[in-house]
Amino acid sequence: MAAPARTPRSRILGCSSMLRFLRNLVGSKGGSKSTNKPLTRSQPSSSWEQDVVSPMMGHQGGRGRKEPRAKVHSAASSNGKREPPPRVLSAAPSNPRHDAFELGTGDSGSQTLTSKDVPKLRAQGVEVTSVPLRGTWEVLEQLPEKKGEEEEPVGEVSGASDREHFGQALETEQGCLQWVPGPLALTPGAFIKEEEDEHCPIEFGDLKPSSCKVGSTPWNYLLGLYKQLQKSAMAKAQRPAAPQLALKDGLPHEEKGEREEAVDESCPKWCAPRASSDESCPKWCAPRASTYQSPLQKKFRSTDTVGFVESELKKILSVQREARLWKVGNPEGRELLTQPDITLEEAGMVDGQHLLLEEMDEMGNWPPPD
């Protein structure tokens, strides 16, 4: 029986099967090269489009349709936010199709997909893989460097701010623990309470308060010091001053034998001679400490008697009891002047000697000798 003649359709199918076989062989050897084509051809740009047309085998071995375009945007969008890097999605069926010769179709089943087609293919059991482009890798490599450069000044600013906060906290803590000298802060409340507060007693020797209130302010301390000084000045002004008396016996100063007797109320019994330019006219004064600003003065003549000098000294010193006069300064010791009729010259009074007026006490006894 003769074999049936081939129809034109069977010839077309046989040629197409042979072409697919050859294409699969070529595709399996150059598969790695074909996958790198998008990486070598892609360049980093703000916006670019890529059209991928892949043959897709149908149930009857026909050529597949053209897939829609997949747009990949740059890493930085127009609004300033970073978008995920563009990727080329390729899908391969889990069960690859076989031709009439039971040979696999190779890369003919892989195709470029959009993000909308990925869920549909995953639901059908198709494996979906993403391949980043070269431009994407370049952008991703530059991003960490820029991020590091941006983090360095931010870190420096944050470090400086942390140091400032730490310094302020440390100063606040030290201000609470230590007292820092500075200008006095005067508040109006100090003027209102100045009459109510008790002033601190002041020691004028070193100008330090002996006892003060715990809540007293520097203003109250200064005010109390001022008032204490003011009171002391007023007390000195109100104290009666000692009268400076110049008792004269009516004799001229040029007369020879004139003697000056200075008497002090605090030590009324002592009289000391004071040398003058004229040896014939010795002057007498009280050598002891005095509370008066200036001692009382009395002038005597060398011819005045001892009784006259004693009576005058009693009047000046306000002596009411019995008294006696001593001559002090002799090499032999002090000498009692018992003769009131002799003169001072006859008594041997010379320069460097003293007269001592001794008063009897209330019991009628003389003070014991030194």
UniProtKB/Swiss-Prot annotation:
Testis-specific. In the testis, expressed only in germ cells and not in somatic cells. Expression starts in late primary spermatocytes in stage X-XII tubules and gradually increases towards step 1-3 spermatids in stage I-III tubules. Expression then declines continuously and disappears after step 7 spermatids in stage VII tubules (at protein level). One of its GO terms (biological process) is mitochondrial fission. Residues 298-370 are annotated as: Interaction with GGN. GO terms for cellular component: Golgi apparatus; mitochondrial intermembrane space; plasma membrane. Gene3D superfamilies: Phosphatidylinositol 3-kinase Catalytic Subunit, Chain A, domain 1. Residues 250-260 have a biased composition (Basic and acidic residues). Residues 26-114, 240-263 are annotated as: Disordered. Interacts with CCDC159. Interacts with isoform 1 and isoform 2 of GGN. InterPro entries: Ub_USP-typ. It is found in: Cytoplasm; Membrane; Golgi apparatus; Mitochondrion intermembrane space. Residues 225-370 are annotated as: Required for induction of mitochondrial fragmentation. This is Gametogenetin-binding protein 1. The N-terminal domain is required for targeting to the mitochondrion. Keywords: Cytoplasm, Developmental protein, Differentiation, Golgi apparatus, Membrane, Mitochondrion, Spermatogenesis. Induces mitochondrial fragmentation, possibly by promoting DNM1L-dependent fission and may play a role in mitochondrial morphogenesis during spermatogenesis. It is a peripheral membrane protein. Residues 31-49 have a biased composition (Polar residues).
